[in-house]
């Protein structure tokens, strides 16, 4: 069976990021899995597959250096759902509470130089990966690691890497979303989250240790409280509910009992649906 050559993609130096600083062990596991199974689709909804000869040739054209440079300038990301509060979880997993509401980041493809076919292909490209890190409230200092006395433990816990979910938002507009519903912070304070979008080429993941950073964004400031001061969880947004209905893995909350009375059935209103 004939082999089809793929073009050699030269990534601009500005896109290359140090593996050990930007990609943590969660990212490594994601990339390894991608390389092993050669991702053909998104977890639930990716409909764009590059398994035929024509598809592979099309992908190679799209991932050429010049095209990727254009793509970089046309891929803004927006935080559709900002984190507001969290309860500090300390150094154990027994009573870990997630950042609320869960951040949702949307990738938008609006380049004037892209055809509709290219726009839809980029929107459904299955191998985007988004990495999350925690920064101080000014957004200028990486706060991922605790002070020396804590043996360099990470401040942010949970699933720090997100994969794309393509679906309709609460206005029935199609989009590509990254949902981070399993993030917790160990210590009280004011912080921001930083999201970095990276494009992976599974066919080259075993030989490349650097992949293009397309864009990044920081959230608004959110507050992490002690258990005593934590104001409680808020009800899930219409956006979160809409994505959940379509198969996105995201927790749905009814709201916290401090904000609304406990129901007659005795359940706390902040339990998952």
UniProtKB/Swiss-Prot annotation:
The keyword Zinc does not apply. Keywords: Nucleus, Sporulation, Transcription, Transcription regulation. Gene3D superfamilies: Velvet domain (2.60.40.3960). It is found in: Nucleus. The keyword rRNA processing does not apply. Component of the velB-vosA heterodimeric complex that plays a dual role in activating genes associated with spore maturation and repressing certain development-associated genes. The complex binds DNA through the DNA-binding domain of vosA that recognizes an 11-nucleotide consensus sequence 5'-CTGGCCGCGGC-3' consisting of two motifs in the promoters of key developmental regulatory genes. Positively regulates the expression of wetA and represses abaA and brlA. Acts as a crucial regulator of both conidiation capacity and conidial quality. Forms a heterodimeric complex with velB; the formation of the velB-vosA complex is light-dependent. This is Spore development regulator vosA. It comes from Beauveria bassiana (strain ARSEF 2860).
């Amino acid at each position: 069976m004939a082999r089809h050559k793929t073009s050699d993609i030269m990534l601009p130096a500005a896109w290359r990021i140090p593996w050990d600083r930007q990609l943590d062990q969660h990212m490594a596991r994601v990339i390894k899995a991608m390389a092993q199974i050669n991702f053909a689709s998104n977890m639930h909804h990716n409909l764009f597959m590059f398994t035929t000869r024509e598809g592979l040739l099309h992908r190679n054209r799209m991932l050429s250096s010049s095209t990727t440079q254009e793509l970089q300038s046309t891929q803004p990301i927006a935080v559709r759902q900002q984190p507001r509060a969290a309860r500090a979880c300390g150094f154990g997993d027994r009573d870990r509470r997630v950042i609320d509401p869960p951040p949702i980041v949307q990738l938008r493809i609006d380049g004037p130089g892209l055809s509709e076919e290219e726009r839809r292909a980029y929107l459904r490209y299955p191998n985007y990966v988004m990495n999350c890190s925690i920064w101080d409230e000014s957004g200028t200092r990486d706060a991922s690691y605790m002070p020396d006395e804590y043996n360099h433990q990470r401040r942010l816990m949970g699933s720090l890497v997100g994969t794309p979910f393509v679906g309709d938002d609460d206005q029935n507009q199609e989009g590509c979303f990254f949902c981070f519903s399993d993030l917790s912070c160990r210590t009280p304070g004011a912080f921001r989250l930083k999201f970095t979008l990276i494009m992976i080429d599974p066919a080259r993941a075993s030989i490349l240790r650097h992949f293009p950073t397309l864009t990044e964004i920081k959230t608004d400031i959110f507050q992490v409280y002690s258990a005593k001061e934590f104001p409680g969880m808020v009800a899930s947004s219409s956006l979160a509910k809409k994505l959940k209905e379509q198969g996105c893995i995201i927790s749905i909350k009814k709201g916290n009992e401090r904000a609304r009375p406990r129901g007659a059935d005795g359940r706390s209103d902040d339990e998952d649906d």
